[in-house]
């Protein structure tokens, strides 16, 4: 009889790995490892009908973290922002449809959690046939090796590489992905915090004036290339102009959540026009997004 496995991975308390943005990078990476392992096992035997991992998103629970009452088991957080644990899922697609290179680590050097970088077992989730890694302008000493022993049943297994860095400067990291001998993807990461900045995105360029339509605005600390930083301090203050109401915390305590956050913008009944959101941070600077509120009228549901 086919056997369906449900609620694999998850998280229990007390537990050394809770998968919060504020937890050590090794804990965040471990979530990706666990999800890769269980899916590899599920595909190792045709008698498994499938596997449902737990969970898609962090969620409120009376059995969650004391004081916060949140279960941090999601591969995405409560704001629906993907964590490193989601990288395994992002990479399970034909590279000719969408090439994927997702580092399951943060490129930081000299911090308490990563004094010499991500270390000897840095994980890369990718569907590319070949990966080339450069620290600064030089090829990394340990080039990626597909871990077919642990993850050989996955169509696109993750890759391990040694990213132990002994130099004292702030080199960039460059990862190139190749398919059929052609470069199809490149990821650049900066270890120099001097170039860090505030970034902000909005999910929808248009919402409608029915008084209930809303869209998410995500802001985060990023490096010079737009990669998320794991740390951030201080508050983000949001300034809204135009016919929309802010749903969420303002100011937002960026450091308490791990360098990122989100709010929602909701339309006002019968009010149309341009909405501008400006986010300000004392050290990361400003970021700005715009969207339009249009008359609802008769909308076609696709």
Feature map (PLM): residue ranges:
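Extended substrate-binding grooves/exosites of carbohydrate-active enzymes
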Residues: 1-182
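Short, solvent-exposed loop/linker segments at the N-terminal edge
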Residues: 109-117, 206-215
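Beta-strand-rich structural segments
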Residues: 120-126, 212-230, 275-279
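Low-complexity "stalk/linker" and mucin-like segments enriched in Ser/Thr/Pro/Ala/Gly
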Residues: 147-154, 242-258
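Short, hydrophobic beta-strand segments
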Residues: 156-168, 252, 256-270
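Extracellular Ig-like/FN3 beta-sandwich strand-entry sites
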Residues: 168-172, 212-214, 270-274
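Edge beta-strands of extracellular beta-sandwich domains
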Residues: 181-193, 285-295
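Low-complexity, Pro/Ser/Thr- and charge-rich linker/hinge segments at domain boundaries
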Residues: 189-212, 295-302
């Amino acid at each position: 009889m086919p056997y369906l496995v449900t609620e694999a991975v998850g998280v229990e308390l007390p537990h050394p790995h809770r998968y919060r943005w504020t937890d050590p990078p090794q804990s965040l990476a471990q979530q990706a490892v666990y999800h890769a392992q269980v899916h590899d096992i599920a595909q190792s035997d045709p008698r498994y009908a499938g596997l449902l991992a737990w969970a898609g998103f962090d969620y409120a629970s009376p059995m969650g973290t004391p004081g916060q009452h949140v279960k941090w088991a999601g591969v995405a957080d409560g704001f629906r922002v993907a964590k490193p644990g989601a990288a395994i899922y992002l990479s399970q697609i034909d590279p000719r449809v969408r090439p994927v290179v997702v580092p399951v680590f943060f490129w930081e050097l000299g911090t308490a959690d990563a004094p010499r970088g991500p270390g000897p077992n840095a994980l890369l989730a990718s569907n590319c046939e070949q990966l080339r890694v450069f620290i600064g302008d030089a090829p990394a000493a340990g080039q990626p090796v597909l871990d077919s022993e642990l993850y050989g049943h996955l169509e696109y297994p993750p890759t391990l590489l040694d990213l132990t860095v002994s130099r004292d400067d702030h080199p960039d990291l460059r990862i190139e992905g190749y398919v059929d001998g052609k470069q199809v993807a490149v990821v650049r990461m900066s270890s120099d915090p001097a170039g860090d900045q505030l970034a902000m995105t909005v999910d929808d360029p248009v919402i409608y004036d029915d008084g209930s339509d809303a869209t998410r605005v995500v802001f985060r600390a990023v490096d010079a290339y737009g990669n998320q930083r794991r740390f951030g301090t201080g508050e983000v203050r949001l300034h809204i102009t135009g016919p929309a109401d802010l749903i969420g915390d303002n100011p937002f305590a960026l450091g308490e959540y791990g360098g990122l956050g989100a709010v929602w913008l909701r339309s006002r009944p019968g009010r149309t026009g341009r909405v501008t959101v400006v986010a300000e941070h004392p050290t990361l600077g400003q970021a700005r997004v715009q969207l339009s509120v249009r008359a609802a009228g008769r909308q076609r549901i696709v």
